């Protein structure tokens, strides 16, 4: 009985000690980390914040349309950010953990709204214990150099450029297919790489390829020859090819099923878009792959499609535009101008091979000029940061300094995280309005008294915002 009593007492003490340790640990964690209201269980949902990011691989940047999503005002660790960064590296560029470990360099930079930044090594596996608030992050840039310095030339990599054409539309690809130099590879291995970039760059899966009208890739060799491979056949030649002999690879997929199965020549016609007097360089072309002969009604539909895709101009925008037309330039020197809003089409047919280029011109109505964009700078405690965006000010009527105050406070909050309360306790908070006539007006952001003067947004040249905060004394 004494033995049983001893065991019972020992177990009880162990439970109490364990409970006490857990309680102390939780208490210490709660004391070390401030309560994050966005993650409280009292709330039914989270308010998210979108943080833009860029990826640079071997010196080549890629335009990223998506953003990293975090809970607003959440305190997170650098390990949490690293997991997000590794995820988008794998999803957007196919770079795995192994690739990062074997890379020459792999790092990401966190840019903060106060103008500071922090560089983190993705290969180190060492994390600082600091926590950062998601609302303080302005952007994240990821930089990976996968090119290991080869100890001998036999181990160097070869980069093979490739293009992807889907339904007649080409896309400019900034990355390359990577192979070991002088590596003998099979067409099956090559097909695996091609299918991988089709899925990562254009979202085309194996199922999409099987159901497509046509799916093939062309291997262009440095000796001038080429070989076309059907991605749907599943049949592979036993020949091996040397990676150093490949000049480029062209991938072509037509996902549009048609009744006719005749293979026809693919005609590409270059085009440009001029919107409100500003032209942009268009890397893709208009394609006439299935029917080189077309009427002007179909051509107008294609023009409207690229306007929507490239510049976001809808049918409604064209309807209210001041001007909306396109000019077809022919190889024989002739040209034809067609109105995009007209419903009357000539019965003439045009052959794609006769078209030299197409210029699209759109001038939007007064709706596009309803706002004026004024450049501005922000200096906090004497440190300025370049602002890529501009202050959007209504151009419809005369504005007051109270209206301008609200705009300035809004960008201070969004760009540098400075709230109304921060301004109230700031040492100094003001902005200077520079007018085009050479005059200027200094406005105190801490004052609620405004001059009754009204002025037009078109008269403003620029705005400089200056905030000086009291420095916090360090606790000893």
Swiss-Prot record:
Signal peptide (UniProt feature, chain positions):
1-30
Tell me the InterPro entries matching this sequence.
MAP_dom (IPR005298)
Q: Report each MAP repeat as a residue range.
A: 45-153, 154-263, 264-372, 373-476
Q: Tell me the keywords, alphabetical order.
A: Repeat, Signal
Any idea what this protein is called?
A: Protein map
- Could you tell me which species this protein originates from? Staphylococcus aureus (strain Mu50 / ATCC 700699)
**Designated gene of the protein:** map
């Amino acid at each position: 009985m004494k033995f049983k009593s001893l065991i019972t007492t020992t177990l009880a003490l162990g439970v109490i000690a364990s409970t006490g340790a857990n309680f102390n640990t939780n208490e210490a964690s709660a004391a070390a980390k401030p309560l994050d209201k966005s993650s409280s269980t009292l709330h039914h949902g989270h308010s998210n914040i979108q943080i833009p990011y860029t990826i640079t691989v071997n010196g080549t940047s890629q335009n990223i349309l998506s953003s990293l999503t975090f809970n607003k005002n959440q305190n997170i660790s650098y390990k949490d950010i690293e997991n997000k960064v590794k995820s988008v590296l794998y999803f957007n560029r196919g770079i795995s953990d192994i690739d990062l470990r074997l890379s020459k360099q792999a790092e990401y930079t966190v840019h903060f709204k106060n103008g500071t930044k922090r560089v983190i090594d993705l290969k180190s596996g060492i994390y600082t214990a600091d926590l950062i608030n998601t609302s303080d992050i302005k952007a994240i840039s990821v930089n990976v150099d996968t090119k290991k310095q080869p100890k001998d030339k036999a181990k160097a990599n070869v980069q093979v450029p490739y293009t992807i054409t889907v339904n007649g539309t080409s896309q400019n690809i900034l990355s390359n297919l990577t192979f070991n130099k002088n590596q003998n590879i099979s067409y099956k291995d090559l097909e695996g790489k091609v299918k991988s970039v089709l899925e990562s760059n254009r979202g085309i899966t194996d199922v999409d390829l099987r159901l497509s009208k046509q799916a093939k890739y062309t291997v262009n060799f440095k000796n001038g020859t080429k070989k076309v491979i059907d991605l749907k056949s599943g049949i592979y030649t036993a020949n091996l090819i040397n990676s150093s002999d490949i000049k480029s690879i062209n991938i072509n997929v037509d996902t549009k099923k048609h009744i006719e199965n005749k293979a026809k020549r693919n005609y590409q016609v270059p085009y440009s878009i001029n919107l409100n007097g500003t032209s942009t360089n268009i890397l893709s072309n208009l394609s006439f792959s299935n029917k080189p002969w077309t009427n002007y009604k179909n051509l107008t539909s294609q023009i409207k499609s690229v306007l929507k895709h490239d510049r976001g101009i809808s049918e409604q925008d064209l309807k209210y535009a001041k001007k909306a037309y396109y000019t077809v330039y022919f190889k024989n020197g002739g040209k034809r101008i067609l109105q995009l809003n007209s419903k009357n089409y000539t019965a003439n047919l045009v052959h794609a091979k006769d078209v030299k280029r197409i210029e699209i011109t759109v001038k939007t109505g007064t709706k596009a000029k309803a706002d004026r964009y004024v450049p501005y700078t922000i200096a906090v405690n004497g440190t300025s940061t370049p602002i890529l965006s501009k202050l959007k000010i209504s151009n419809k009527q005369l504005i007051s300094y109270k209206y301008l105050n609200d705009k300035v406070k809004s960008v201070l909050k969004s760009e540098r995280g400075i709230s109304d309360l921060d301004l109230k306790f700031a040492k100094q908070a003001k902005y200077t309005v520079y007018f085009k006539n050479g005059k200027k007006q200094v406005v105190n952001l801490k004052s609620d008294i405004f001059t009754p003067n009204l002025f037009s947004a078109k008269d403003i040249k620029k705005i400089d915002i200056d905030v000086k905060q009291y420095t916090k004394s360090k606790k000893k």
